[in-house]
A protein has these predicted regions:
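Extreme N-terminal starter segment of soluble prokaryotic enzymes
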Residues: 1-5
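Cofactor-binding loop segments of dinucleotide-utilizing enzymes, especially the Rossmann-like FAD-
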Residues: 7-9, 34, 89
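Short N-terminal binding/cap micro-motifs at the start of the first secondary-structure element
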Residues: 12-17
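Flexible gly/pro-rich beta->alpha loop and the following alpha-helix that scaffold active-site loops
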Residues: 19-85
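Conserved catalytic-core motifs of eukaryotic protein kinase domains, centered on the activation segment
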Residues: 61-64, 96, 106
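Catalytic nucleophile loop
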Residues: 78-101
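Pocket-forming structural segment of enzyme catalytic cores
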Residues: 98-183
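Acyltransferase
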Residues: 180-230
Length: 230
C-alpha cells in the first residue's frame, strides 16, 4: 500500500484535513511526532512522498528543536526523489535548506483567513493551474521567508508576506495552512490573537464563513499533489 511520510513538528500543528484527503485516495499516512521524541527517518525509502508540517520554531533553531538537523537531512534526501510538500515551518525549512533566508517575527503577522495573489508562474504549475487570480487560505505565522533559493519559483504572495508559496522542482512550500479547518481556528488562544492585533471573534467568524470555499480550493490543490504519489 502507498504510504506518505508526515513529520509533525508541534503538538498543535497536526495533519488535520490531510488525513481525510489521504484516506480518500487509499494512501496510508506515516506520522512521525518529532516534537514528542519520535526519531526522524534518515531517508524516504518505502515512502511515496514527504510532508513537513508547521511549528513555532525557526528552521535552524536546533537547540530549541533538536530534531531539526535530521529533518533538514531528510528533506535533502527526499528532494528530487519523491514529491515534497512543506507547510508553514515546512516551507521555511525548504527555503532555508536550499539556500534561502527565513527571519523570525518579520513584518506583520498573519492570522486567520487571508487573501492570496496567484502569480503568473502558477498557470503552468501542476498543483495550481486553473486557479483564479486570488484565493483564500488560513494563515498562522509571524516568521517568514525573506529570500527565496536561487532556483525557486514564486507562485503566490499576500499583502503582508510576499513569499507565500514556492516550488523547487517537485518540492512545494506553502506559508499558509491548507490542512486547517474552522474547528482548529476556534481553539486558537484569544489572548494571543489580541496581542497580535486580531479580533478573536472575527478570526473565527471568517474561518466559519469561508469554510466551504477553503475546503474546495485546498482539497483540489492537495489532491493534485497526492496524484503525483505513486
Amino acid at each position: 500500500m502507498t504510504s506518505v511520510l508526515i513529520i509533525e513538528n508541534d503538538r498543535d500543528s497536526g495533519p488535520g484535513r490531510l488525513l481525510d484527503w489521504l484516506d480518500e485516495r487509499g494512501i496510508t499516512p506515516a506520522v512521525v511526532r518529532a516534537w514528542d521524541g519520535e526519531p526522524v527517518p534518515a531517508s524516504v525509502d518505502g515512502y511515496a512522498a514527504l510532508i513537513l508540517l508547521g511549528g513555532g520554531m525557526l528552521p535552524d533553531e536546533d537547540e530549541r528543536s533538536p530534531w531539526l538537523p535530521a529533518e533538514r537531512a531528510l528533506l535533502r534526501a527526499a528532494h528530487g526523489r519523491v514529491p515534497v510538500l512543506g507547510i508553514c515551518l515546512g516551507a521555511q525549512l525548504l527555503a532555508h535548506t536550499f539556500g534561502g533566508e527565513v527571519q523570525g517575527k518579520y513584518g506583520q503577522p498573519e492570522k486567520g483567513v487571508t487573501s492570496l495573489t496567484v502569480l503568473p508562474a502558477a498557470k503552468d504549475d501542476v498543483l495550481l493551474a486553473g486557479l483564479p487570480s486570488t484565493v483564500l487560505a488560513v494563515e498562522s505565522h509571524q516568521d517568514q521567508i525573506t529570500r527565496l533559493p536561487d532556483d525557486a519559483v514564486l507562485l503566490m504572495s499576500s499583502e503582508r508576506c510576499p513569499n507565500q508559496m514556492l516550488r523547487i522542482g517537485q518540492s512545494w512550500g506553502v506559508q499558509f495552512h491548507p490542512e486547517v479547518e474552522a474547528d482548529r481556528v476556534r481553539g486558537w488562544n484569544p489572548e494571543r490573537l489580541r496581542s497580535l492585533g486580531f479580533d478573536p471573534d472575527a478570526v473565527v467568524a471568517d474561518a466559519e464563513r469561508h469554510a466551504a470555499e477553503l475546503d474546495k480550493t485546498w482539497s483540489a490543490v492537495v489532491g493534485r499533489f497526492l496524484s503525483l504519489v505513486g
